[in-house]
């Protein structure tokens, strides 16, 4: 009866408390009953369950083998923790990782739990498996108020973990100022190294903790490297921690020069160096000028080393340009930027700010002398080149003197660079013949080969320094004068090694007046290399990423409708930010989920076809049936100019992101995009017969023909004939044999340009939002078509099948056999160039070569014989699709001459 009553009481208590009132006898089961109660600090329930139980309070359970005391300490369950301690829980029991309850309480900042554990003799000096003690955990998390209570129980405040790190190390690394002060006041060793030799100051600098670094330095911390020689300053620069660098330099001024010298270290990232120097330069005007002067001196020294042929070109070139880039960046962020019109760099370097360029004048002086001497000696020694070797020897000796002078300047010697006159050095050259005889004799071309790249890199540095002193968009008059002065030598450099243009002559892209001097050399470079140069500069400054990506912001997605793709695309593109479109494109069709590059390609493909849709009246089909020209009557559509701007944006955007468009324009329209003047040959695309008539006028004497032409033409203006003068007073000026070329050019401009000028302007306004005019001029009209529309596949067998032969050639002639063998050997790009060379188009019409159009309709590809003379190049008549092929004596000569014509240009337009 008594037992039954006891069971009934247990049942009643269980139901009232909604839990069991007895622990299972099995420890494993019992502990999982108690654990949630301990976590919730339900100490009364825990006490009740433990009172009538034989449960082992030190029972370790779970994967990490912790006791309930660990759980209580970890969760801050103070009442349960005290209860467990009173019932015999071991405060120093370690789990599988070596952590005691005190470790867990310290890690989580459980102050009351820590106090009770210490009352019950918890050992503060126990280390876990990684060597961490309770004070390490407090230091990691900055629990200063708890640390004050704990350190009085610690026998060794410098106890080390497995890596030799003390609590001071980790507190400094994590930037806990009060914790660092507490540890130092408790006797922590301020210079104690870990196993790799890293001190607390090293740790503070590794994470840019300026406040803890400041405390350490004020308390007398030593500036020590680790065992690998890495210093606290190295760490600050690697992380871009400008504020911490500033603290180090304030306490150790000698580190300033070390920092400046670090700009030569190619292992350090340039952007972090910039961040550090940018911060330091903004602290004061004096420091700003000091940094720039230091950088200028280092650049000068490196520049002279680069001019010495005994140095490593690649390493010295990269070092010089790197230093100069950093110099220019720091200069631009100064108190008075050139962009705001104050303190211009072309004012003669009179202001203190521009005096920082003075050390560089020594380098520019050496550069100028090198170029003058090479020009002089090449002219003087065209036949006898023995003296030119002397240049190399003597100039290097003088450059070594310049390096010494630069060093003297760096340590504070003042003086003028003007004493290094050209006449002084010219006198030195008079006595260098003996020295020259001691060296292997090199001719002028060898000297250029050895020095061109080095001098060109210094020229690039000179341009960068000149440019950073100018407002945006302006070219330094000094640099323009420099290029004009040394024009012949610079052209000699790039003729000998065209890669110099792409490697060092970036100034050409930013200065049209200089670009024009080198354009013929640039255009002669391989198409592929110019493409790489184009995109290198086009994408400069853009983050490295997949160019066509899904933006994070949903608002950046272009949402368009398939059934109104032209108008809906026009709306969303006009609303979009141009810079965001440069960073990436994401397109989604309304009602569809698909996104990605495939959708973007489809969008460009469909949209480019819509641009030439007759419904919008923007473009009209040309005479060849495959290309399009702006419609002079597009004004029938009220929004036509906005639509032309949109068309320009789409083609510019496609070119920017290397997406091909399914549209081909007339040769003249490509010229308009490139800024190339049109000529009478371009008229053939819209009116072949009229083009022939213009050709006839040019080819024949019109003096006695009685044409009575004037400088005016009759034009149909909305159904009414109007006389339009080609120039002021043109209706009264007769066309004569003397002025007929002007007449042909003016009438061409009327038909091909003036009639569609508003449309061209609208298109270019949109196109130039993405493609700068200076970059696109790297290409001709044929190459621009390839850039925009890609390279078509060419069936050589179909080409052979539909080719005619004239002027003495037959299908089986040896020269013809060689020709087709060469065509088979050409790359796809070269075949397209050949097709363009002869037909003026890179495309084969639908149906193949049998449907190629000429000036008067269908006209097969034709090869005509021409008498051979040495070095004669093939020519073409694009109006009649004729290749004029000399009767070359060998296949090798044929291939060589053909490739020269294709790559260097030998286009012609003649009558049949």
UniProtKB/Swiss-Prot annotation:
HECT domain mapped to chain residues: 577-912
- Taking the record's annotation, the residue ranges forming a coiled coil are none
Query: Which SMART domains does this chain map to?
Result: ANK (SM00248), HECTc (SM00119)
Chief subcellular location: Golgi
Keyword Transmembrane attached: no
Pathway stated in the Swiss-Prot or TrEMBL entry: Protein modification; protein ubiquitination
Which GO MF terms are attached to this record?
small GTPase binding; ubiquitin-protein transferase activity
Keywords from the UniProt entry: ANK repeat, Cell cycle, Cytoplasm, Endoplasmic reticulum, Golgi apparatus, Membrane, Repeat, Transferase, Ubl conjugation pathway
Q: Single GO cellular component annotation? A: Golgi membrane
Q: Where in the cell is it found?
A: Golgi apparatus, Golgi stack membrane; Cytoplasm; Endoplasmic reticulum
Q: Which reaction does it catalyse?
A: S-ubiquitinyl-[E2 ubiquitin-conjugating enzyme]-L-cysteine + [acceptor protein]-L-lysine = [E2 ubiquitin-conjugating enzyme]-L-cysteine + N(6)-ubiquitinyl-[acceptor protein]-L-lysine
Q: Which Pfam families match?
A: Ank, Ank_2, HECT
EC annotation from Swiss-Prot or TrEMBL: 2.3.2.26
Ranges of the ANK repeats in the UniProt entry? 23-55, 64-93, 97-126, 130-159, 163-192, 196-226, 228-253
Catalytic positions are 879
How would you classify this enzyme at the top EC level?
transferase
- A GO biological process this protein is involved in? ubiquitin-dependent protein catabolic process
Question: What is the recorded function of this protein according to its Swiss-Prot or TrEMBL entry?
Answer: E3 ubiquitin-protein ligase involved in Golgi membrane fusion and regulation of small GTPases. Acts as a regulator of Golgi membrane dynamics during the cell cycle: recruited to Golgi membrane by Rab proteins and regulates postmitotic Golgi membrane fusion. Acts by mediating ubiquitination during mitotic Golgi disassembly, ubiquitination serving as a signal for Golgi reassembly later, after cell division.
In terms of PANTHER family, this protein maps to: E3 UBIQUITIN-PROTEIN LIGASE HACE1, HECT DOMAIN UBIQUITIN-PROTEIN LIGASE
Q: What is this protein called?
A: E3 ubiquitin-protein ligase HACE1
């Amino acid at each position: 009866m008594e037992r039954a009553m006891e069971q009934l009481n247990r049942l009643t208590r269980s139901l009232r408390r909604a839990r069991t009132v007895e622990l299972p006898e099995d420890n494993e089961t019992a502990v999982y009953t108690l654990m949630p109660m301990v976590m919730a600090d339900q100490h009364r329930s825990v006490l009740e369950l433990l009172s009538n139980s034989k449960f082992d309070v030190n029972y370790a359970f779970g994967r990490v083998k912790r006791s309930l005391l660990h759980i209580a300490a970890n969760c801050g369950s103070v009442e349960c923790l005290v209860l467990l301690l009173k019932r015999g829980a071991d405060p120093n029991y370690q789990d599988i990782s070596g952590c005691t309850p005190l470790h867990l309480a310290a890690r989580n900042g459980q102050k009351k739990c820590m106090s009770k554990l210490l009352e019950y003799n918890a050992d503060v000096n126990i280390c876990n498996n990684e060597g961490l003690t309770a004070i390490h955990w407090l230091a990691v998390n900055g629990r200063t108020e708890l640390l004050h209570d704990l350190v009085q129980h610690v026998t060794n405040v410098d106890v080390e973990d497995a890596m030799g790190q003390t609590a001071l190390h980790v507190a400094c690394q994590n930037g806990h100022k009060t914790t660092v002060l507490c540890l130092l006041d408790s006797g922590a060793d301020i210079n104690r190294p870990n196993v790799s030799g890293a001190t607390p100051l090293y740790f503070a600098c590794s994470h840019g903790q300026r406040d803890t670094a400041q405390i350490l330095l004020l308390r007398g911390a030593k500036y020590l490297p680790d065992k690998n020689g890495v210093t606290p300053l190295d760490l600050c620069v690697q992380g871009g921690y400008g504020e911490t660098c500033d603290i180090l330099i304030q306490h150790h001024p000698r580190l300033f020069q070390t920092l400046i010298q670090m700009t030569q270290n190619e292992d350090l990232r340039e952007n972090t160096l910039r961040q550090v120097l940018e911060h330091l330069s903004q602290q004061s005007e004096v420091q700003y000028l000091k940094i720039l002067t230091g950088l200028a001196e280092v650049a000068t020294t490196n520049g002279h080393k680069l001019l010495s042929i005994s140095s490593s070109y690649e390493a010295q070139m990269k070092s010089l340009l790197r230093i100069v880039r950093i110099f220019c960046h720091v200069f631009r962020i100064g108190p008075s930027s050139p962009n705001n019109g104050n303190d211009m760099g072309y004012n003669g370097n009179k202001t203190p700010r521009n005096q920082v360029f003075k050390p560089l004048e020594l380098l520019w002086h050496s550069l100028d002398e090198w170029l003058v001497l090479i020009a002089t000696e090449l002219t003087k020694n065209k036949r006898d080149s023995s003296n030119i070797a002397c240049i190399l020897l003597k100039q290097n000796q003088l450059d070594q003197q310049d390096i010494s002078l630069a060093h003297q300047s760096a340590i504070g010697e003042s003086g003028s660079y003007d004493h290094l006159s050209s006449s002084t050095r010219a006198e030195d050259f008079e006595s260098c013949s003996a020295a020259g005889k001691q060296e292997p004799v090199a001719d002028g071309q060898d000297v250029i080969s050895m020095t061109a790249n080095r001098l060109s890199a210094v020229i690039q540095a000179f341009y960068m320094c000149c440019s950073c002193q100018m407002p945006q968009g302006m070219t330094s008059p000094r640099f323009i004068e420099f290029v004009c002065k040394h024009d012949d030598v610079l052209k000699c450099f790039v003729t000998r090694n065209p890669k110099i243009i792409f490697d060092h002559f970036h100034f050409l892209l930013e200065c049209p007046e200089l670009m024009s001097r080198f354009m013929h050399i640039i255009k002669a470079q391989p198409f592929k290399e110019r493409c790489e140069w184009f995109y290198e500069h086009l994408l400069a400054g853009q983050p490295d990423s997949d160019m066509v990506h899904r933006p994070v912001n949903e608002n950046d997605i272009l949402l368009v409708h398939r059934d109104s793709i032209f108008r809906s695309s026009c709306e969303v593109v006009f609303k979009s930010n141009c810079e965001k479109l440069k960073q990436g494109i994401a397109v989604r069709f309304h009602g569809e989920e698909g996104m990605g590059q495939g959708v973007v390609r489809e969008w460009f493909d469909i949209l480019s076809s819509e641009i030439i849709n007759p419904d919008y009246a923007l473009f009209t089909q040309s005479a060849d049936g495959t290309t399009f020209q702006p419609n002079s009557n597009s004004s029938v559509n009220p929004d036509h100019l906005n639509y032309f701007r949109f068309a320009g944006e789409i083609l510019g955007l496609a070119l920017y992101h290397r997406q091909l468009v399914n549209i081909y324009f007339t040769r003249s329209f490509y010229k308009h995009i490139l800024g190339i003047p049109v000529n009478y040959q371009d008229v053939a695309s819209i009116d072949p017969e009229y083009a022939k008539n213009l050709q006839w006028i040019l080819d024949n004497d019109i003096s006695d023909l009685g044409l009575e032409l004037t400088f005016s033409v009759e034009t149909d203006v909305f159904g009414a004939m109007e006389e339009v003068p080609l120039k002021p007073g043109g209706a009264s000026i007769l066309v004569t044999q003397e002025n007929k070329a002007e007449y042909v050019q003016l009438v061409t401009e009327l038909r091909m340009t003036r009639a569609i000028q508003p449309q061209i302007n609208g298109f270019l306004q949109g196109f130039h939002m993405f493609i700068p005019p200076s970059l696109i001029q790297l290409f001709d009209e044929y190459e621009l078509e390839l850039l925009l529309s890609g390279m078509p596949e060419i069936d050589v067998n179909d080409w052979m099948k539909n080719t005619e032969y004239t002027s003495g050639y037959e299908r089986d002639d040896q020269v013809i056999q060689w020709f087709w063998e060469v065509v088979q050997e050409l790359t796809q790009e070269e075949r397209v160039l050949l097709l363009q060379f002869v037909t003026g188009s890179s495309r084969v019409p639908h149906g193949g070569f049998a449907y190629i159009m000429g000036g008067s309709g269908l006209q097969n590809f034709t090869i005509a014989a021409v008498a051979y003379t040495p070095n004669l190049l093939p020519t073409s008549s694009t109006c009649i699709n004729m290749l004029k092929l000399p009767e070359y004596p060998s296949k090798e000569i044929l291939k060589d001459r053909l490739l020269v014509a294709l790559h260097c240009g030998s286009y012609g337009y003649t009558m049949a």
